[in-house]
């Protein structure tokens, strides 16, 4: 069975519960609007021609499209259809083309057409009655009545919706563009004056981050549902389901089958709550101008028929980007101008209907575009001897499965090992899917193959040379592609919000597209279905907050244990030289209250599940110690800019002290480490950053140690010894919170103790799958971290805890050569950490909760500016 989506809501959101939602109106059309007659993609080299639904149950001669063009309801078979997707479903009435796809006299009024006699064969009208009949060309008022184009008007602040009588809410139009790289916006007013006006007059972000893989199907459906691909099930433009034993592709028939599509898209959410939705997808045979005119006509329908949510979809500039590459300015300008012209037609049409101060418009892309070509292709035949035994979904990422499901010799671990660090100039990195960076959220679905290749930007991967698609002339068919890691700058896309509900002339920080579903629900007054977004994190886009998020309730209250008077009963197999270390005197420090205000700058993290844990105070750090996991759930400390890194004296090199506040039965034992040659231990608070010689001893308490593979200690020690100090120096002090993560079933959620026992049966110490670190400072580096009264800055990591460092091909070199790159690959959001730990951070701060949610959903990408 398909896995449930990750997130707080997901264990109750099984796909078998939601697939049936597609039986509602419009749901059957979920996939076809962007699949017909598309440019061939790199990951479809081996696929056949595009298909439409054959053996249609609809009979074309069973009716006519007269007065039915682009009707909002789909006719039931055997009756024929006249809706926007009847072409894709091979279900149109015989006269659909003649009556509904008229192009006579073009799409614009000219002076000589003003006041023309109505001719029903025209594509749009310039007659005196066209306004009353709702079928004017969009420039009618400009050409025939002397009005100005919308783009030529000054920006105006629309403080409240100005809608005609009968409108119960501002309608929402989602204008989605395929392959719109964020940097295209730099072309500005000369190329895209209408889009530039939307940007400058409304709300925009420098870019919006797509989900991984940065492909069309996964991202359009994420925009519609707020779910990651592993959650909604559309994990690629092409995919294989081992339970269905069926393949899904842009060119195959399976895309028509509802069983592939999980989650609840916005149009179903609207329909379930009594809000009518217009169509979201269009067959490509319908010209852009006709799509715009149809939306405008729907807006003039009677109150009881009018939809309140619409979508327009453009196949450009993606098609041009694939063919010519994103940097071919000469060839990319025209597609961008055409999109801008269509935006202008929409806005002029809204103004003509006096709806330009009523309607909310979202202009959004699905992903970016990278420069690539056939010549930059890695062939697996240069690495593996058995490429005939595997199926590779090739291109800007690679997914590998056995050609035969009965191949008992196929071992994903062997494939990964044979592809790991084989060449010094290798342009892809192989992963078992559960080892992929957690920020990708790309593992917990049966349609995601066990072996995954992350491909370098600008490169492709293929099985062998003959798999690379070229023209018969031998020339490369494409010069651009997408699908790469979603944090790289070329994959970022555009977001603009314009209308009475969006803020005026406002720039907001970048965000991920999983958040837009909640915003769309807020714009329409809907309650969102469960999703992976963080509702309220984008409240700063809107004039008024429709939804007010609340801080989650703390479930487990901590205990504050006191130290026992004697250490005689604390035999945990650990040693420390009592004479040199003066342990009895040091144990008295347990009675001293810690420095919570210094080390818990943003309040104590809350535990959101039932468990028993203790707050342990120390001079240099605070810990939330779990008696279940025998280690801290979190440790927090603040390091000033002036802090010094000191060495560990020889007599402390192997010192581990018992903690008299925690009974031996609830502590780890040094004996467990002596008996396991594959496992060592590290420290959550680094002894090297202790503020004094006396305070250093606190770091050697057994309640500060965590199980670590020796290989991983290289990563952790470099992070603590070098990077934390560097961050503190660069950022004028930092607060660090770190701790363990247990995600053995790789569902992106906190594992229960029962779940962990299934994977580490017989182990005395539960070994984390990852460790996290949250580094927070003031956004204004002139302010010290502990005296910050402005916005905060955060970077976070989820570091894989593995017995080797094979992910880094140069891991035999000095740590300064590779550890930082590894950390950058495993950057993450605070929200990702919260879901993996069931902890809640930043609970005590003067900032608004919306600001905190924005901080939690921020991803530090380490990429250059767009």
Model-based region annotation:
Residues 151-203:
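Active-site-proximal N-terminal segment of extracellular/periplasmic enzymes that hydrolyze or transfer
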Residues 375, 519, 538, 549-866:
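Domain-level detector for secreted/extracellular nuclease and nuclease-toxin modules, and
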Residues 392-506, 511-519:
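Active-site neighborhoods of enzymes that stabilize oxyanions during catalysis
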Residues 222, 226-327:
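His/Asp/Glu-rich, glycine-adjacent segments
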């Amino acid at each position: 069975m398909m896995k449930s989506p990750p997130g707080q809501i997901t264990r109750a959101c099984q796909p078998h519960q939601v697939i049936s939602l597609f039986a509602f109106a419009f749901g059957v059309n979920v996939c076809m609007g962007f699949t017909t007659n598309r440019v061939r993609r790199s990951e479809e080299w081996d696929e056949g021609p595009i298909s439409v639904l054959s053996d249609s149950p609809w009979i074309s001669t069973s009716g006519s499209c007269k007065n039915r063009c682009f009707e909002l309801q789909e006719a039931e078979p055997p009756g024929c259809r006249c809706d926007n997707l009847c072409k894709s479903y091979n279900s149109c009435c015989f006269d659909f083309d003649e009556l509904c796809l008229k192009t006579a006299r073009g799409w614009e009024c000219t002076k000589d057409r003003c006041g023309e006699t109505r001719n029903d064969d025209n594509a749009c009208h310039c007659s005196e009655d066209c306004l009353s009949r709702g079928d004017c060309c969009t420039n009618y008022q400009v050409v025939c009545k002397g009005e100005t184009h919308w783009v030529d008007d000054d920006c105006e602040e629309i403080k409240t919706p100005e809608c005609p009588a009968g409108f119960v809410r501002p309608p929402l139009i989602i204008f989605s563009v395929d392959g719109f790289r964020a940097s295209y916006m730099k072309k500005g007013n000369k190329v895209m004056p209408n889009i530039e006006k939307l940007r400058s007059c409304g709300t925009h972000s420098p870019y919006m981050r797509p989900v991984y893989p940065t492909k069309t199907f996964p991202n359009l459906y994420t925009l519609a549902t707020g779910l990651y691909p592993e959650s909604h099930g559309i994990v690629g433009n092409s995919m294989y389901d081992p339970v269905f034993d069926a393949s899904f592709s842009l060119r195959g028939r399976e895309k028509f089958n509802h069983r592939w599509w999980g989650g609840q898209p916005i149009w179903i959410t609207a329909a379930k709550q009594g809000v009518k939705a217009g169509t979201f997808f269009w067959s490509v045979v319908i010209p852009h101008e006709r799509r715009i005119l149809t939306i405008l006509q729907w807006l003039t329908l009677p109150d009881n028929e009018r939809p309140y949510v619409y979508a327009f979809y453009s196949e450009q500039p993606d098609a041009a980007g694939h063919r010519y590459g994103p940097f071919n300015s000469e060839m990319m300008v025209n597609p961008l101008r055409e999109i801008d012209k269509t935006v202008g037609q929409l806005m002029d049409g809204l103004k003509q209907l006096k709806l330009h101060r009523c309607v909310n418009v979202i202009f959004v892309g699905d992903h970016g575009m990278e420069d690539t070509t056939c010549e930059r292709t890695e062939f697996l035949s240069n690495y593996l001897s058995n490429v005939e035994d595997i199926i590779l979904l090739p291109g800007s990422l690679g997914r590998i499965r056995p050609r035969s499901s009965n191949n008992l010799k196929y071992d994903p671990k062997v494939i990964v090992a044979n592809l790991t660090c084989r060449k010094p100039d290798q342009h892809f990195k192989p992963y078992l899917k559960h080892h992929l960076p957690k920020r990708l959220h790309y593992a917990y679905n049966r349609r995601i193959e066990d072996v995954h290749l992350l491909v370098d930007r600008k490169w492709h991967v293929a099985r062998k040379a003959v798999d690379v698609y070229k023209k018969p002339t031998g020339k490369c068919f494409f010069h651009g592609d997408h699908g790469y890691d979603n944090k790289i700058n070329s994959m970022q896309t555009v977001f603009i919000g314009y209308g009475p509900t969006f803020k005026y002339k406002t720039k907001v920080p970048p965000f991920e597209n999983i958040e837009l579903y909640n915003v769309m629900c807020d714009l329409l007054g809907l309650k969102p279905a469960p999703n992976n977004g963080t509702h309220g994190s984008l409240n700063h886009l809107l004039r008024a907050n429709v939804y007010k998020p609340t801080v989650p309730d703390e479930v487990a209250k901590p205990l504050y244990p006191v130290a026992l008077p004697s250490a005689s009963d604390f035999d945990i197999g650990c040693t420390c030289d009592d004479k040199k270390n003066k342990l009895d005197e040091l144990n008295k420090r347990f009675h001293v209250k810690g420095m919570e205000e210094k080390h818990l700058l943003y309040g104590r993290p809350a535990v959101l599940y039932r468990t028993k844990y203790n707050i342990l105070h120390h001079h240099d750090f605070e810990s939330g110690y779990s008696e279940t996991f025998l280690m801290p759930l979190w440790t927090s400390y603040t390091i000033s800019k002036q802090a010094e890194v000191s060495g560990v004296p020889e007599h402390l090199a192997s010192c581990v002290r018992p903690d008299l506040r925690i009974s031996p039965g609830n502590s780890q034992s040094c004996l467990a480490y002596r008996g396991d040659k594959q496992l060592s231990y590290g420290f959550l608070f680094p002894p090297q950053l202790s503020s004094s010689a006396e305070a250093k001893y606190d770091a050697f308490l057994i309640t500060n140690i965590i199980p670590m593979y020796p290989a991983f200690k290289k990563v952790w020690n470099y992070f603590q010894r070098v990077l934390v100090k560097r961050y503190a120096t660069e950022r004028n002090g930092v607060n660090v919170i770190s701790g363990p993560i247990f995600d053995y079933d790789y569902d992106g959620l906190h594992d229960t103790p029962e779940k962990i026992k299934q994977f580490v049966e017989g182990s005395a110490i539960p070994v984390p799958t990852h460790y996290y670190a949250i580094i927070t400072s003031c956004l204004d580096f002139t302010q010290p971290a502990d005296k910050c009264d402005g916005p905060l800055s955060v970077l976070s990591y989820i570091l894989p805890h593995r017995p080797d460092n094979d992910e880094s091909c140069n891991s035999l070199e000095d740590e300064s050569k590779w550890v930082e790159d590894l950390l950058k690959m495993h950057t993450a959001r605070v929200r990702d950490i919260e879901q993996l730990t069931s902890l809640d951070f930043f609970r005590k701060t003067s900032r608004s909760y919306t600001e905190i949610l924005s901080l939690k959903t921020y991803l530090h990408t380490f990429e250059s500016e767009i």
